[in-house]
Amino acid sequence: MSSKVSRDTLYEAVREVLHGNQRNXXKFLETVELQISLKNYDPQKDKRFSGTVRLKSTPRPKFSVCXLGDQQHCDEAKAVDIPHMDIEALKKLNKNKKLVKKLAKKYDAFLASESLIKQIPRILGPGLNKAGKFPSLLTHNXDMVAKVDEVKSRVKFQMKEVLCL
């Protein structure tokens, strides 16, 4: 077998997986894991890599986003019915680990205003960072709905060592 897979072959395989899923109507959401082997890549020398990719469609429509913002962003979030918290509500959590963990569990992602993002570790402690949900930056000149859609359509990837082949 060749070391490279053509784009057409990959697309055909993905289409086949999706059509197989439609034939077997299941009452739960299935996840598909794509595993790729990298040739001539030394994980010892070239450290592991990770990042995010924005997809054309939203893979998780029930993905919940909360805006942590100043007054202007809170008003904007209220107008478009997005859950939001201002600095006073965050201070009420008072670095309580259980409450911060509960907040991190309640939402899948967070957006924070420029003025607030530097204060979040001081106000909430390391709870959001430990949960892997540190907020993305939300600026005043960017549209909030577009930013929420962007966060919903992003997926994270990371390279892990393969245990067995």
From Swiss-Prot:
Name of the molecule in the record: Large ribosomal subunit protein uL1
Similarity section: Belongs to the universal ribosomal protein uL1 family.
Residue list for modification Phosphotyrosine: Y11
CDD domains reported for this sequence: Ribosomal_L1 (cd00403)
Phylogenetic lineage: Eukaryota, Metazoa, Chordata, Craniata, Vertebrata
Residue list for modification N6-acetyllysine: K91, K106, K118
Residue list for modification N-acetylserine: S2
Keyword Ribosomal protein among UniProt keywords: yes
InterPro entries, A to Z: eL8/uL1-like, Ribosomal_uL1-like, Ribosomal_uL1/biogenesis, Ribosomal_uL1_3-a/b-sand, Ribosomal_uL1_CS
Cellular component, GO, one term: cytosolic large ribosomal subunit
Keywords assigned by UniProt, alphabetized: Acetylation, Cytoplasm, Isopeptide bond, Phosphoprotein, Ribonucleoprotein, Ribosomal protein, Ubl conjugation
GO molecular function, one term: RNA binding
Main location: cytoplasm
Cross-link (Glycyl lysine isopeptide (Lys-Gly) (interchain with G-Cter in SUMO1)), chain numbering: K118
PROSITE patterns: RIBOSOMAL_L1
